[in-house]
Amino acid sequence: MSLRSFKILTVLTLAFCALGMEAQMSNLYGPPISVENAKKAAAAALAEAVKNHWTMAVAIVDPNGTLIYYEKMENTQNGSANVSINKARSAALYKRPTKALQDALAKGGDGLRILALEGAVPVEGGIPLIMDGKIVGAIGLSGGASDQDGQCATAGASIIK
C-alpha cells in the first residue's frame, strides 16, 4: 500500500469514527426486507405524504443498499428520484438515520468529515428499517423539505417490526 493510499484510508477511518458511536445503531444486519414488507413501508410513507398534501418519492433498499422497491408520486420533482434512493442507501450503509449525519455536519468542526464518506447523505429523510432487532434495509424519502421527508420516512419505518 502506498503512503498516499494509507493516508486516505486513515482519514476516511477517522471520519467514520467522528460520526459518533451514539448515532450509529448497534443492530446487526439481518436478511433483506421482503418486497411485500417494502411495499407496506412505502405505502405508509406515501400515505403520510398524501395526508399532508406533499409529493414524494420513496425508495426501500436492502442492508447492502440494493434497491428493493421504488415509487414516485405524480408531480414529484424529478430530482427526488435519485435523492430518495441515496438517502435510503446512506441510512443502510452507515446504520443510522440521515438526520444524524445532517446534525453532525451542522455542528461543523469534525462533523465536516462526513463529506468525505462515500455515499453518505447528510440530509434528513433516510432511516434504517429494523425487524426482529436487525437492520433489514432502509427507507428514503425525497420531495418535500427535509423535515417533511423525515416525517414520511418515520411513518414508513414505524410499520416494520
Model-identified regions with their sequence ranges:
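Bacterial N-terminal signal peptides
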Residues: L9-G20
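Residue-level signal for beta-strand positions within conserved beta-sheet cores that form or flank
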Residues: R4, L19, W54
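Flexible, solvent-exposed loop/hinge segments and secondary-structure transition points
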Residues: A23-K161
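Bacterial N-terminal signal peptides that target proteins for export
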Residues: M1-T10
